[in-house]
Amino acid sequence: MIVADHGRDFAPDQYVDLSAYRVPCVIYAPGIVPPGRLSTVCSQTDVAPTVLGLLGGEFDHGFFGRNLLAAPSGEGFAFAYVNDMLGWVSGRRAVVLMPDRPPMLFRITDSGQDPASETEIAAELPPLREKMLSIYGVASRLYDEVRYCSPEKAATVVRRPE
């Protein structure tokens, strides 16, 4: 598996361009993984569970991601966080939150993104924003409370000083 660390340069305080977060990932495993292209939204949190899936067997892991080779097509989401911008992509929609700005909703296209219409924003932004913040909040809390793994493993985790 070959995966990049990040996409091209961006300036989130000037313009929110989520295409800067598109990161290539290539799995080369002849005889194990057939050639193809995933159409689902995924993120770097999915890398380790996918590698574990390629190894086979059952794994008790605390990753918030999923095995991309076993995930349903079209499912998935990805977060982008830099400076004070939090972006969330799910399907063909993206929500972006920045301090001192109203929440933004974008339509994701094959060539980039387009701002959503006022009608789309009124209808779609509130439930998408709520889902985004719920997922982010749960992940953050599980991490802070070391509840992302079994109690036995949690006992061995070195905790951050308060």
Predicted regions and their residues:
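Solvent-exposed soluble domains appended to multi-pass membrane proteins
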Residues: M1-E162
